[in-house]
């Protein structure tokens, strides 16, 4: 029993539909158990060209599971009509067609962050830096050096662990940068742990999805950044709050 976590769908309804299908398969349930809730780390919109279908799928999932969502920087930009890169004319047109849609109601009360059982869930980063756009939590970026940037404020792992500690939190799960990363605060210092995804099982003839996983024990304070749930090999995660599993899937040909 635990939570499925996904981020950066970017209007890719095919990818989020694949996730929804995968977590119902016997193989997934045997490996991870019952899914109690879904956690969306933001960026449902922009870049892709199926925003309506994506938001319809999110509304469907909210009826099937307890769904918690936090705001992403592209969600923030879309809602506030801020120009950001990455969307082609077709994507821009289809997003503009969504203005005024009741499907956008899910953003009405969407928070910037959420926490549960000692873990902070946020799109970008944990720092309280005021209300300037690029310093908001949904725009912050995990990096090796800190400072302001045209793409959002860069923070380091030590800064994140300090911010968590002040709030009595132990772990953080974020998205935003579309690449998995794991930083563990060990007695010997902060260590970036390589993430090596391996097949969950030998692919059988009746397996609908090929699932790869990398499991991380949550026995020390940990920063976990989840890859993007878009494209041909959507990435997401599962946690029971004792172990965190990075997951990548691809559909059977």
Ranges and model annotations:
Residues 1-57:
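N-terminal active-site segment of His-dependent metallophosphoesterases
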Residues 10-14, 46-49, 74-80, 127-129, ...:
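Active-site environment of divalent metal-dependent phosphoester hydrolases
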Residues 6-7, 37-42, 68-73, 121-122, ...:
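Active-site neighborhood of phospho(di)ester-bond hydrolases with catalytic His/Asp-centered motifs
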Residues 1-4, 114-120, 218-222:
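Beta-strand-turn-beta hairpins that frame and shape the catalytic cleft
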Residues 126-141, 171, 177-201:
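Divalent-metal (often Zn2+) His-rich catalytic cores of metallo-beta-lactamase-fold enzymes
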